[in-house]
Swiss-Prot record:
Record's signal peptide: 1-18
Cellular location(s): Secreted
Organism of origin: Penicillium expansum (Blue mold rot fungus)
Domain LysM: 37-85, 126-172, 215-241
UniProt name for this protein: Secreted LysM effector LysM8
GO MF terms held by the record: chitin binding
Record flagged with keyword Secreted: yes
Free-text comment about domains: The LysM (lysin motif) domains are small globular domains involved in binding chitin in eukaryotes. LysM8 contains 3 LysM domains.
Gene disruption: observed consequences: Leads to enhanced fungal virulence, with faster decaying on infected fruits.
Length: 241
């Protein structure tokens, strides 16, 4: 029976399914056809890490990637395969017809484009029209705001971006200007040269940092590993390595 399961799983790797967004490599067999974002399994990456950093439940991850529960107990990843971490849901048809023209939000004097989802911040003064394939993280990064801000200003989107609707406007800036910007690379004032590689290394640093590092980030309160890696343009796996 075990050999039949492995044979069936291998056949799944050879199947050519169509996806909403094509993965850059081999997808895990059975991955959701509506997948719009992928992560590659590599050494040190676990299902739990994926759940936490992409804001999903165990059940959602298994639903989008049924193969993780087919190779033994618990959640199992196969190195180098791509796993689905986001699915673009088709929004339900609204029961009302959005107006064709823009309207002024009551009280703040800012003209608000339509349609918008319910629960948008009343003091919003900057808007973005969502298109198919967008993700909350990509929008927040492009607009220079944090995911926390995006979720706070657009409560209908949900805390995992599951209800982000294409062709609707969301808020990406407010009048008060109280935003949390994505982390930026900052050099410490005191520096010392790392032995052997000739690169000036800022201090203080944590032990175990790569000896051939040539780019640094000063961690501030509220930083997360995923946000730092994304802002610096490096893979989360490289960051942990």
């Amino acid at each position: 029976m075990r050999s039949l399961q492995i044979f069936a799983f291998a056949l799944g790797l050879c199947s050519a399914d169509a996806y909403l967004v094509t993965p850059p490599g081999t997808p895990a067999p059975g991955a959701a056809s509506g997948c719009s974002e992928w992560v590659q399994a590599s050494y040190g990456l676990t299902c739990d890490i994926i759940h936490r950093f992409y804001g999903m439940t165990d059940a959602e991850f298994e639903e989008w990637n049924p193969s993780v529960s087919q190779l033994g107990d618990g959640c199992n990843l196969i190195s180098d395969l791509y796993y689905c971490v986001q699915v673009n849901y088709v929004p339900e048809t609204p029961t009302w017809t959005p107006p064709a023209t823009t309207t002024a939000s009551a009280g703040n004097g800012v003209t608000t484009p339509t349609p918008t989802q319910a629960g948008m911040a009343k003091d919003c003064n900057k808007f973005y029209l969502v298109v198919s394939g967008d993700s909350c993280y990509n929008i927040a990064t492009a607009q220079g705001i944090s995911l926390d801000n995006l979720y706070a200003w657009n409560s209908a989107v949900g805390s995992s971006c599951k209800d982000l609707w294409p062709d609707y406007y969301i808020c990406v800036g407010v009048i008060s200007g109280t935003t949390t910007s994505p982390p930026t690379t900052t050099s410490a004032t005191t520096t010392t040269t790392t032995v052997g590689n000739g690169v000036v290394t800022p201090t203080p640093i944590q032990t175990g940092m790569s000896t051939n590092c040539n780019k640094f980030h000063l961690v501030v309160k509220g930083d997360g590993c995923y946000d730092i890696a994304a802002a610096a343009g490096v893979a989360l796996n490289d960051f942990y390595a």
